[in-house]
Swiss-Prot record:
Name of the protein described by the UniProt record: Arginine transport ATP-binding protein ArtP
Signal sequence, renumbered to the chain: none
Ligand binding (ATP): 35-42
Organism: Escherichia coli (strain K12)
Underlying gene: artP
Family: Belongs to the ABC transporter superfamily.
């Protein structure tokens, strides 16, 4: 089992953002978190690499175990983030580094790869994500879709077991959205586990092998992709019809 959450409760000050979240996602699945604004999708995603710290519950992810009755050590959090990559909605590329430099920075510093090893790994990913012509460009000179592909390549440089996406197609036009969907589907063939937050039902339908539908910090429905054609709850049925 690649990801297991049990009884996760998360607060921002006095406001509770997640209520008793329990879910499983086997290795190699693509799990999509769906729901209206304020449902808790991004909070849940951020729990998976401990950008948000729950107040209670347990998390197993990529071989790392956390019991939130105790505060995790800095080393445990670092170990987790080596195995769990994140592609942010705003891309978060380093503006002063070229595409190639963006890719090799973390593997050299964090994984201790030599520059040659990192460059060889980067070369393969630039090829795979159709970014070869842009390797010497700076993020400022790339379109939104190109920046998103660089962000995905950068996360894959760490060879994570789990890859998290926060609204990967937000603000992208339909053609670029189709490219990102295609990349996610290609990655699904490689046995990497993916978790995707989106509010775009079509993106979810095209990528998800499992789906979790949330409202107001609660899981309302979860299951495999058949939920899209046979929703089990009125709430999810209504959401899909809008």
């Amino acid at each position: 089992m690649s990801i297991q959450l049990n009884g996760i409760n998360c607060f921002y000050g006095a406001h509770q953002a997640l209520f008793d979240i329990t879910l499983d996602c086997p290795q190699g699945e693509t799990l999509v978190l769906l729901g209206p604004s304020g449902a808790g999708k991004s909070s849940l995603l951020r729990v998976l690499n401990l950008l948000e710290m729950p107040r209670s519950g347990t998390l197993n992810i990529a071989g790392n175990h956390f019991d939130f009755t105790k505060t995790p050590s800095d080393k445990a959090i670092r170990d987790l983030r080596r195995n769990v990559g994140m592609v942010f909605q705003q891309y978060n590329l380093w503006p002063h580094l070229t595409v190639q430099q963006n890719l090799i920075e973390a593997p050299c510093r964090v994984l201790g790869l030599s520059k040659d090893q990192a460059l060889a790994r980067a070369e393969k990913l630039l090829e795979r994500l159709r970014l070869k012509p842009y390797s010497d460009r700076y993020p400022l000179h790339l379109s939104g879709g190109q920046q998103q592909r660089v962000a995905i390549a950068r996360a894959l440089m760490m060879e994570p077991q789990v890859l998290l996406f926060d609204e990967p197609t937000a603000a992208l036009d339909p053609e670029i959205t189709a490219q990102i969907v295609s990349i996610i589907r290609e990655l699904a063939e490689t046995n990497i586990t993916q978790v995707i937050v989106t509010h775009e039902v079509e993106v979810a339908r095209k990528t998800a092998s499992r789906v979790v539908y949330m409202e107001n910090g609660h899981i309302v429905e979860q299951g495999d992709a058949s939920c899209f054609t046979e929703p089990q709850t009125e709430a999810f049925k209504n959401y899909l019809s809008h």
